[in-house]
Amino acid sequence: MTTVITRKYRISRRLGVNLWGRAKDPVNKRKYPPGQHGILGFKKLSDFGKQFAAHKKFKFYYAISSKQLRRTFLDAYNRKGYTADNFIGILESRLSSVLYHSGLVPTIYSAKQLISHKHVTVNDKVVNISSYRVKPGDIIKIRERAAKIPVVVEAEQKQERKAPDYLEADSKEHSVKYLRSPQYSEVPYSADMEVNLVVEFYSR
């Protein structure tokens, strides 16, 4: 897990934002990219550069590939309503996103790991696919045998993050109920994700 956290710190510094809101993230003090020439600071970005950077924020925040992110956008674009709201709604309905934002695990990476190791159920059925889309009313739960895994115990003891209004979490039962699809303003991002720039990036 230490390796994962270190990698996350490098990502945050490369993007110039504290992407996951960690208090110890070096980007809080060092506002420049990592590496030998990082101290020179960030280059001024073109409009495309800004759009590309916004796309990378979402890619790293949700720990998904560029291909997955593009598929998500196309799905959002083809739905009725505002593309940006649809985009956020789909990302937040991913099983890994729900588990992470519930506060039952400390990171998106630990959420994905628990899911892939079959430690998570949806409506009492084991689901081992992080991209599985939950529906309003679904109950996600960490299996009893996984309740003593260090990352789960850590999250329960620290309770650093409160579940947003569209989730109903129960730390004692290690469960969370997905109530509804959220809007961008409701998602507890610790940085400005600039979703409109992502829409522009994929709409070129």
UniProtKB/Swiss-Prot annotation:
InterPro entries referenced in this protein's UniProt entry, alphabetically: Ribosomal_uS4, Ribosomal_uS4_bac-type, Ribosomal_uS4_N, S4_RNA-bd, S4_RNA-bd_sf
Residue ranges constituting the S4 RNA-binding domain according to the UniProt record: 93-156
A GO CC term assigned to this protein in UniProt: small ribosomal subunit
Annotated GO biological process: ribosomal small subunit biogenesis; translation
Alphabetical keyword list: Ribonucleoprotein, Ribosomal protein, RNA-binding, rRNA-binding
Keyword Ribosomal protein (UniProt): yes
Entry annotated with the keyword RNA-binding: yes
Quaternary assembly: Part of the 30S ribosomal subunit. Contacts protein S5. The interaction surface between S4 and S5 is involved in control of translational fidelity.
Record PANTHER family: 30S 40S RIBOSOMAL PROTEIN (PTHR11831), SMALL RIBOSOMAL SUBUNIT PROTEIN US4M (PTHR11831:SF4)
Family stated for the protein in its record: Belongs to the universal ribosomal protein uS4 family.
Cited function: One of the primary rRNA binding proteins, it binds directly to 16S rRNA where it nucleates assembly of the body of the 30S subunit.
NCBIfam families, alphabetized: PRK05327.1, rpsD_bact
Protein name per its UniProtKB record: Small ribosomal subunit protein uS4
Organism per entry: Wolbachia sp. subsp. Drosophila simulans (strain wRi)
